[in-house]
Design a protein with these regions (language model features):
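Proline- and Ser/Thr-rich low-complexity, intrinsically disordered segments
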Residues: 769, 796-826
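Short, surface-exposed alpha-helix to beta-strand junction/turn motifs within ectodomains of secreted
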Residues: 542-580, 607-612, 623-628
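Short coil/turn motif common to extracellular beta-sandwich-like domains
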Residues: 539-545, 686, 813-823
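Extracellular glycoside hydrolase catalytic/binding regions
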Residues: 133, 139-283, 288-303
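Active-site mouth of glycoside hydrolases
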Residues: 1-196, 201-209
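Extracellular calcium-associated, cysteine-rich motifs in secreted modular proteins
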Residues: 767-803
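Extracytoplasmic
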Residues: 343-529, 555, 583, 595-599, ...
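Aromatic-rich peripheral "rim/lid" segments of glycoside hydrolase catalytic domains that contact
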Residues: 264, 268-361
Length: 826
């Protein structure tokens, strides 16, 4: 397929690639290249690698034209000329797989005529009849499968026959698809009654309309999955078919994503006892396959020419470039992405991290691109870790697109000073990366970071075994993103001998490029004063954690409470408790009486002599130590919540809204869909909630719930019916009143009780139960009658009892005089 060779949009289907190459270097040289490509693309060494990683089967994508001629090239119409090359490829693969006890599953990836509108996949040529438009093509496919079955009927390492890959064609009811499948099955069973037959649905294998019930007693239904978010219920659409039809399932194709996505999806498949295969073992210039084929300059020149951005290469230049590309297919010439097999096998069963190659040494240089192998949140944390195609477009999980397939963004550079030619970039606040290291001698160290940045103000710090060992480092511009310089101001780091986990943490959203950190021992640990290093918020959202450069004496903590002060947004807050951080020697936790918010500016101060290190040193006084606030964002209630801005969502679609203010809205609602939002309420009270909704056809219903810490128990606070508005973008506002919500932090769940509506936003307001314009929280007269004039406390300004007043009129003495009057008494 063209995208695998970087020619997508230029030459996608194989026949287009071949024609373009013939135009450049002639038919003979093109055929020589294709033969070399087939020879080098998958060899015994590839099979050995798959076996070593843990695979027990190989799905072989086949093009029919390596085994038989196209119908238009047959010397006698309706007959079949057999070509040995394709069968020899299968024979070789079976021979290589047998010592490893690996099965080979034969996949008809390109059927006669092509089986889908997506020509890149099946080599469909729209100027000719497709498989579905030609009985001759269908006959050839049936005959080919019978020929294959005759040849391999007795081979025990054939894992089965995947009859047609990823049909994507308009086939009403699946009728013709089933007819062709049944014809192939009948032909195979005439000669081979043993091997499994794999059946893929229409619409890229996932539409099984018309394909049930099964027509053979040794059949498997095969589905595919790409790009969409991996959720626990992703297989709920297909698992019932397995049970209802009593037919096994096989996930025959997936991939093209990040390591995180791979681990999650494979874990889900294994949990549900569904076998799987992966696409693909190697591609040109990509990071998401185990082997990356190097893109040579000559081939790049060909691509540039096809794009209209370069000169046409000569015939010899083109031939040399393509033969070099074919040579680069060999494993020994590829870039091996060891992180991918690790994600697909080891990481699906453990959260443990392991060194990328071997433990890096201190003293010495730590190359930051060689971080530990493991999952997101265990070996690293990155804000973007997979491509979920939520907006229908590709979204890169790795902005550098080099070296590894995680969310950690890696680029290449030409720096020759303390560098392996790679650096971390595109950093964001809260991200971190871990390294298994071995410290050879206890002592005081300095660190030198190799950094490039166009901007000033990027920040990072280091920790060892999750205890900070440096203050937050602020970076000044080096003059450019590729202008690397030493940042040498990292001193007085105390490290203990032994094996540890070193982490680099990025503390704000100003990006930096950083390639390495070199550690140099400067003296004994006793030469460094006992001092505070950093402070961070804690996930309980009421505490801060202070880090020190030495271990803290636990016996000195209790008496030190009065020596600390915590200031939030300029106001000192009451400290509740101070304690040693669990399982940590260099950290204490200060818990406050009140909650903290993600937007708070927090500083810590210390003045006294109470807190001591285990070596007996008194803590140096400090003031205005800025606390790194990493709390998750919460919506402050009362306030507005944009419906699409949830922490977790299930089942909704997101679309552009035509409502006032623009933005997005949630849509495609069905009963059971839900979205979770993190909220903070600043007082304990009920609220009124406005919901901005639209609906084309009928009414719906929304429920709001407070969810407990386990995420399993819900407490209803209100429900509201959504009206029919006669348009999906015809908006109106409906209101409901909630039960009392306590003060503090909560998870709010918005659940669809009855679907068929769009939701733009919902807004919590303090209620005004009597409708007098004064919020209940300050309304001293909460039940005033409608229309009563009230003051700012919500109480009536005055009242006039109907039976306790008198009005009288005295006329003027003469027309034109002004001595008349009106009187009022109560």
């Amino acid at each position: 397929e063209g995208y695998m060779n970087q020619s997508a949009g230029l030459a996608g289907p194989q026949h287009e690639i071949k024609n373009k190459l013939i135009e450049l270097m002639g038919k003979d040289k093109t055929e020589t290249f294709f033969a070399e490509w087939r020879k080098n693309h998958f060899t015994k060494r590839d099979v050995d690698s798959l076996a070593a990683w843990g695979f027990n089967s190989i799905r072989l994508p086949m093009h029919y034209n390596l085994m038989t001629l196209p119908i238009e090239d047959e010397p006698i119409a309706g007959e079949n000329t057999w070509i040995e090359e394709g069968f020899t490829i299968i024979d070789n693969l079976l021979e290589w797989a047998r010592p490893h006890n690996m099965y080979v599953i034969l996949d008809m990836h390109a059927a006669p005529g092509g089986q889908g509108y997506n020509a890149d996949i099946s080599d469909y040529d729209s100027s000719k009849a497709s498989l579905w438009e030609s009985t001759a093509n269908q006959n050839k496919l049936v005959a080919l499968w019978k020929k294959i079955a005759e040849r391999y009927k007795d081979n025990e390492w054939i894992g089965g026959y995947d009859l047609i890959n990823e049909t994507n064609w308009d086939l009403p009811g699946g009728t013709l698809l089933r007819q062709v499948f049944e014809r192939i099955t009948t032909a195979i069973r005439e000669v081979d009654k043993n091997h499994i037959i794999y059946i893929e649905g229409n619409d890229y294998a996932n539409n099984f309309t018309g394909l049930t019930p099964p027509w053979d007693d040794n059949m498997v239904y095969s589905f595919h999955k790409y790009w969409s978010t991996v959720n626990d219920d992703d297989l709920d659409w297909i698992l019932p078919m397995r049970d209802q039809q009593n037919v096994p399932l096989w996930m025959g194709e997936s991939g093209e994503n990040s390591n995180t996505w791979y681990t999650r999806f494979i874990s889900l498949l294994e949990k549900n006892d569904v076998g799987w295969a992966w696409w693909t073992i190697k591609k040109v210039g990509d990071i998401d396959s185990p082997f990356s084929v190097k893109l040579n300059p000559g081939y790049q020149k060909i691509l540039d020419y096809w794009k209209g951005e370069g000169d046409k290469p000569t015939e010899e230049e083109a031939y040399a470039a393509m033969m070099k590309l074919a040579d680069n297919l060999l494993i020994e010439n590829c870039l091996y992405r060891k992180d991918i097999p690790d994600a697909m096998f080891r990481q699906t069963t453990t959260d443990d991290v392991i060194p990328y190659s071997e433990k890096q040494s201190i003293p010495g240089r730590i190359d930051l691109s060689d971080y530990d192998l493991g999952k997101n949140n265990f070996a690293y944390y990155d804000t973007t870790v997979s491509d979920n195609r939520e907006n229908g477009e590709f979204s890169a999980w790795n902005s550098g697109w080099r070296y590894r397939n995680d969310g950690v963004d890696i680029e290449e550079n030409n720096d020759l000073n303390n560098s392996n030619g790679k650096h971390i970039g595109f950093t964001n606040k809260g991200e971190w990366i871990s390294y298994s290291v071995k410290v050879f001698q206890t002592g005081a160290y300095k660190a030198v970071a190799r950094i490039a940045s166009q901007e000033t103000g990027g920040e990072f710090h280091l920790s060892l075994n999750d205890e900070d060992i440096t203050t937050t480092q602020s970076i000044t511009s080096t003059g450019g993103w590729t202008t690397f310089k030493n940042h040498s101001d990292i001193n007085n780091i105390i490290l203990d001998e032994g094996e540890h986990i070193l982490k680099i943490h990025f503390d704000n959203d100003i990006p930096i490029n950083i390639s390495s950190i070199k550690f140099v021992r400067t003296g004994a640990a006793s030469s460094v004063d006992f001092a505070a290093i950093n402070g961070n918020t804690v996930s309980d959202e009421k505490s801060i954690e202070l880090s020190f450069n030495q271990s803290v004496s636990s016996s000195s903590i209790e008496s030190s409470k009065d020596d600390f002060s915590i200031v939030v947004n300029g106001l000192e807050k009451e400290i509740n408790t101070i304690s040693l951080s669990p399982n940590k020697q260099r950290k204490i936790i200060i818990t406050l009486k009140e909650n903290l918010l993600y937007s708070d500016e927090i500083v810590a101060n210390y003045s006294g002599s109470s807190l001591k290190s285990n070596s007996g040193q008194e803590l140096k006084s400090f003031s205005d130590l800025l606390i790194n606030n990493t709390l998750q964002q919460r919506f402050v209630i009362p306030g507005k919540i944009e419906a699409e801005a949830s922490k977790v969502k299930f089942g909704f679609g997101i679309e552009d809204t035509e409502d006032e203010g623009g933005g997005k809205n949630l849509g495609y609602t069905d009963a059971g869909d839900y979205a979770d939002y993190l909220i903070y309420t600043n007082s304990s009270q009920p609220y009124s909630v406005d919901f901005r909704v639209a609906a084309q056809n009928g009414t719906g219903e929304i429920g709001l719930y407070i969810v407990d810490a386990t995420g399993t128990r819900e407490f209803e606070i209100c429900t509201v019916e959504t009206p029919k508005t006669d348009g999906w973008q015809t908006w109106t506002t409906v209101t409901a009143n909630t039960k009392n919500i306590g003060k503090g932090i909560f998870t709010l769940r918005m659940k669809v009780l009855k679907g068929g509506f769009n939701l733009n936003w919902f807004e919590f307001k303090e209620p005004d139960s009597d409708g007098d314009g004064i919020k209940d929280s300050i309304d001293n007269c909460s039940d005033t009658p409608e229309g009563t004039a009230v003051d700012f406390t919500g109480c009536p300004i005055f009242t006039l009892p109907l039976d306790n007043n008198k009005v009288w009129v005295t006329s003027a003495s003469c027309i034109g005089n002004t001595d008349g009057s009106i009187g009022l008494s109560v």
